[in-house]
Swiss-Prot record:
Residues 1-31 form the signal peptide. The 4 large subunits of the cytochrome b6-f complex are cytochrome b6, subunit IV (17 kDa polypeptide, petD), cytochrome f and the Rieske protein, while the 4 small subunits are PetG, PetL, PetM and PetN. The complex functions as a dimer. This is Cytochrome f. It is found in: Plastid, Chloroplast thylakoid membrane. The chain crosses the membrane at residues 283-302. GO terms for cellular component: chloroplast thylakoid membrane. The keyword Membrane applies. Heme binds at Y32, C52, C55, H56.
Length: 317
């Protein structure tokens, strides 16, 4: 089985498991990590943009916090925050309203990877909870993804990470490395094939007069908006269940004028930070140096006191 097929099957299986665990029906618009894994060999483009932004068009703030420096072969935590108003509801694939789901991709330096369960301290395990992080692909263990998961529970995530050991991995050095992170809340507006989801604005395809607005399905919802152009031709714009119409019959519209509101309440954001893989020998050398400086200072103080005593004795004599 090729790596691409393996990745697709594994990602799809994970999406189903996570959806069941979160009590969510995993629709294509929700399973955004699967889209990225299926369509992009690398989630970060050459211009620095993370590919999730291709489908999640709105921007929202995200935050990531990691230690300033770590020692080799050490487990540390990255804290991810996807802040949003927990009271808002998003449009689901069936047009109904529901809670937002969240997901993220974390691009670590080469050599860094998800910490094995037996290496993760109990304190960090408790913070991680039931989240299951997976590598982006079998060859890219330094890139981690998770989602969709319930936003109310996981708007803050803790990722246990194992730092590499340059003594064992010759491709790693004691340097400062960048870490890239992208996170989103809510469903996307565009599918990878370019088609719109029902979580976005729908615009008029032509200028003219709205001559009819017809319900597509009483059960599933949605509308057909018929627009008569100046030459008498009638074009029909189909609007799925989800967005609310903001036009009415008899109204004149321009091409690309919004026919609906913007139902999207989520958004995507990305951030980056840095981490230093610290050489233990440097720390030991620094401690020795500080100890030497401290000892020198103590000896100088003692020598000064001894000199003062000698001076005092000579004056008394």
């Amino acid at each position: 089985m090729s790596n691409q097929v393996f990745t697709t099957l594994r990602a799809a299986t994970l999406a189903v498991i996570l959806g069941m665990a979160g009590g969510l029906a995993v629709s294509p618009a929700q399973a955004y990590p699967v889209f990225a894994q299926q369509n992009y060999a690398n989630p970060r483009e050459a211009n620095g943009r993370i590919v999730c932004a291709n489908c999640h068009l709105a921007q929202k703030a995200v935050e990531i916090e990691v230690p300033q420096a770590v020692l080799p072969d050490t487990v540390f935590e990255a804290v991810i925050e996807l802040p949003y108003d927990k009271q808002v509801k998003q449009v689901l694939a069936n047009g109904k309203k529901g809670d937002l789901n969240v997901g993220m991709v974390l691009i670590l330096p080469e050599g860094f990877e998800l910490a094995p369960p037996d290496r993760v301290p109990a304190e960090i395990k408790e913070k991680v909870g039931n989240l299951y992080y997976q590598p982006y692909s079998p060859e890219q263990k330094n890139i981690l993804v998770v989602g969709p998961v319930p936003g109310k529970k996981y708007s803050e995530m803790v990722v246990p990470i194992l730092s590499p050991d340059p003594a064992k991995n010759k491709n790693v050095s004691y340097l400062k490395y960048p870490i890239y992170f992208g996170g989103n809340r809510g469903r996307g507006q565009v599918y990878p094939d370019g088609k719109k989801s029902n979580n976005t604005i729908y615009n008029a395809s032509a200028a003219g007069k709205i001559v009819a607005i017809t319900a597509l399905s009483e059960k599933k919802g949605g509308f057909e908006v018929s627009i008569e152009k100046a030459n008498g031709e009638v074009v029909v714009d189909k609007i799925p269940a989800g967005p609310d119409l903001i036009v009415k019959e008899g109204q004149t519209v321009q091409a690309d004028q919004p026919l609906t509101n913007n139902p999207n309440v989520g958004g995507f954001g990305q951030a980056e930070t840095e981490i230093v893989l610290q050489n233990p020998a440097r720390i030991q050398g620094l401690l020795v140096f500080f100890s030497f400086v401290l000892l020198t200072q103590v000896l100088l103080v003692l020598k000064k006191k001894q000199f003062e005593k000698v001076q005092l004795a000579e004056m008394n004599f």
